Amino acid sequence: ETYDVNVMGSVKVLEAARKCRSLRAIISVTTDKCYENREWAWGYRENEAMGGYDPYSSSKGCVELVTSAYRRSFMQDQGVGLASARAGNVIGGGDWAEDRLIPDILKAFEKNEPVVIRNPNSIRPWQHVLEPLSGYLVLAQKLYENPEQYAEGWNFGPFDGDAKPVGWILDQMTSLWPGQKWILDVDMQPHEAGYLKLDISKAKAKLAWQPTWCLESTLKRIVHWHQVWLENRDIQAECLNEIGEYMRDMKHANH
């Protein structure tokens, strides 16, 4: 099912896009897990080998290969810019997905239960959801204006200093929600990469894009968003306010 949805689903979307003559720019979003993880200390660059230990990760590497094939076989001849984007571990308010760190933490907080964690030393490139979205918009504009120059793979991750261990995230979150704690799950767990970072040098140099919010600020915003939701306040207004703050901070950071 994972391969059917991620790989063949992407093929079907790209096949439909190939037949749509009005399209000028397409971004295929995969994940940082598309890279062959070597557990090294450096961030992965866009020209690193695709791979993946598990079906999910390898399926995303496959999507990158599919995207590259469609770009070279079809899209470039039609003058369509087809790029791929690889974001880090995206977090933010309103995420209720299963088996994800931040939602699991908030669910435990709501129940006043300790957070059970399996890999506190795993390092991930955490970033607020608005960060890669802003990068995708910049990339889409560049693709539209100059498809030949920008039709390739791009990383949109945090600054190196915000690639933090899971345990650090838990310590920050429990400090923001007094009375909470976390405990280690000692049972056998599925394989999971211990160290994963993205090199965003290319996006900074060629797109003039860079992250806006630090991880500490992002975690504070997530807790605030969730508390607004728990109090049944206007969550749409909160979302719009957060987007406005991000745009202002991004403009200020780029000047």
Describe every region a protein language model picked out.
Residues 4, 28, 46, 134, ...:
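Phosphate-coordinating loops and pocket residues in cytosolic domains that bind phosphorylated ligands
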Residues 1, 40-44, 97-101, 132-133, ...:
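Short, glycine/charged-enriched secondary-structure capping and boundary segments
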Residues 31:
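Residue(s) in the substrate-gating loop at a strand-loop-helix junction
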Residues 1-15, 19-25, 34-90, 95-97:
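Catalytic helix-loop patch of NAD(P)-dependent Rossmann-fold dehydrogenases
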Residues 6, 10, 98-102, 136, ...:
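Amphipathic alpha-helical segments in well-structured domains
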Residues 109-255:
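C-terminal substrate-binding subdomain of Rossmann-fold SDR/epimerase-dehydratase oxidoreductases
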Residues 14, 68, 106-107, 220:
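Solvent-exposed, non-membrane alpha-helical residues enriched in polar/charged side chains
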